[in-house]
From Swiss-Prot:
This is Probable dihydrolipoyllysine-residue succinyltransferase component of 2-oxoglutarate dehydrogenase complex, mitochondrial. GO terms for molecular function: dihydrolipoyllysine-residue succinyltransferase activity. Binds 1 lipoyl cofactor covalently. Its cofactor is (R)-lipoate. PROSITE patterns: BIOTINYL_LIPOYL (PS50968), LIPOYL (PS00189). GO terms for biological process: L-lysine catabolic process to acetyl-CoA via saccharopine; tricarboxylic acid cycle. The active site is at H424, D428.
Length: 452
């Protein structure tokens, strides 16, 4: 114990020397050593690494509060940037001593945001947070026990009580009983009653007049945009201002794809675990059509507003995914080299990460062409906006049965409208129309994609 105490004081002495900048030769007392150790045995938590080109973010939420014990690498807060949400993790285990910023504050690169006391020992029952919750739940349970000490069996009987049918059965007799009750006073005093009822009728309109304003609310909710929504708004407006956007339309018969999917979806799901959808067919069709119309997969780059046309022999396919915070476009790398099942699997993985807010900046960077499927929400027709610096975006829509003339006969077919918005600065109308026609041909004859 003596050697441990001397070593502890020696460490405190060194800490004091380092912090003060002077050489400390006098002995350090045990109490002073404890004070110094508690003060300096701490770790400052900095902002997480930001993606390239991002210099600041917003502290969205604290997941741990001061006084709670945190483990190493445990998430204690989340930071919202223009593109992704980044978790803040504890570099060491200890008690969260102080929060240096508040929720909603703007934070910059390498900024200190919290302090952890690394000298604190972990509590026996885990972190302090769960203990507080356990106390609250215990108090709530105790309150329930005190409120119903002898009716432990009643909750089972009370469950059907909220049934509207039961309430209506009880209220029905009561609604019929006032009629005879109302008649009895009329027999006892027939004349005074009508006289009293007249002022009541006059007062009822006043009651309804005062009740009308409360039944029609005119409140407004003003919600400040989060960083992602602000960035989305800026980019969409930038696209409209910079690109010479034009949209061309077509429609395709989905009969072949629907039949193919119906025939093999269960077998594919059983063997591979991949749930085949329609997006993979359109993704494959687009990558095949790009081989003939490479401008669709290009971009305009260079100084000023752009003076260089860029053509590519690969396709990094951006897939639009709706999340609670806004639309994101994770990227499937080298989609042109992937099979239908590989594309479908990648879409499922990226979609799950997007909805869970777990996308990394690498997952969304440098797409070359975008597909947006508004049909899953019931959209019948629409014009998508180009995702700069890309030059085109394909919009898919709902599949609806419509009458179609085939070989002189009107027959019902599952049809889908397609919308291709393109930047007319790089893509000519002929190229855009040809590209969309090729996509239509591949979808209406999926086997053709395997032969190209």
């Amino acid at each position: 114990m003596t050697s441990y105490g001397n070593g502890f004081r020696m460490m405190a002495k060194c800490l004091l020397s380092l912090r003060s900048g002077y050489s400390v030769t006098a002995p350090v007392s045990k109490s002073m050593a404890n004070v110094l150790w508690a003060r300096y045995a701490s770790t400052r938590i900095k902002t997480p690494p930001f993606p390239e080109s991002i210099t600041e973010g917003t502290l969205a939420q604290w997941l741990k509060q001061p006084g709670e014990y945190v483990n190493k690498d445990e998430e204690i807060a989340s930071v919202e940037t223009d593109k992704i949400d980044a978790p803040v993790t504890a570099p060491d285990a200890g008690v969260l001593k102080e929060q240096l910023v508040k929720e909603g504050d703007t934070i910059t690169i390498d900024q200190d945001i919290a302090v952890i006391d690394t000298s604190a020992a972990p509590p026996e029952g885990g972190s302090a947070g769960p203990k507080k919750d356990e106390v609250k739940t215990a108090d709530a349970d105790a309150a329930k026990d005190l409120s119903t000490p002898q009716d432990s069996s009643k909750p089972i009987e009370e469950k059907p009580m909220p049934d509207l049918g039961a309430e209506q059965k009880e209220s029905a007799p009561s609604s019929t009983k006032p009629a005879p009750d109302a008649k009895e006073p009329e027999f006892s005093s027939p004349k005074p009653k009508p006289a009293k009822s007249e002022p009541v009728k006059q007062s009822k309109p006043k009651a309804t007049e005062t009740a009308r304003p409360s039944s029609f609310s005119r409140n407004e909710d003003r919600v400040k945009m989060n960083r992602m929504r602000l960035r989305i708004a800026e980019r969409l407006k930038e696209s409209q201002n910079r690109a010479a956007s034009l949209t061309t339309f077509n429609e395709c018969d989905m009969s072949a794809v629907v039949a193919l999917r119906k025939k093999y979806k269960d077998e594919i799901l059983k063997e591979t675990g991949v749930k085949i959808g329609f997006m993979s067919f359109f993704s494959k069709a687009c990558t095949q059509a790009m081989k003939q119309i490479p401008a669709i997969n290009g971009s305009i780059e260079g100084e000023g507003k752009g003076d260089t046309l860029v053509y590519r022999d690969f396709c990094d396919l951006s897939i639009a995914v709706a999340t609670p915070k806004g639309l994101v476009t994770p990227v499937i790398r080298n989609a042109e080299s992937m099979s239908l099942l590989e594309i479908e699997s990648a879409i499922a993985t990226l979609g799950s990460k997007a909805r869970a807010g777990k996308l990394a900046i690498e997952d969304m960077a440098s797409g070359t062409f975008t597909i947006s499927n508004g049909g899953i929400f019931g959209s019948l027709y629409g014009t998508p906006i180009i995702n700069l610096p890309q030059t085109a975006v394909l919009g898919l829509h709902a599949i609806k049965e419509r009458p179609v003339v085939i070989n002189g006969q009107v027959v019902p077919r599952p049809m889908m409208y397609l919308a291709l918005t393109y930047d007319h600065r790089m893509v000519d109308g002929r190229e855009a129309v040809t590209f969309l026609r090729l996509v239509k041909e591949y979808i209406e004859d999926p086997a053709k994609m395997l032969l190209v």
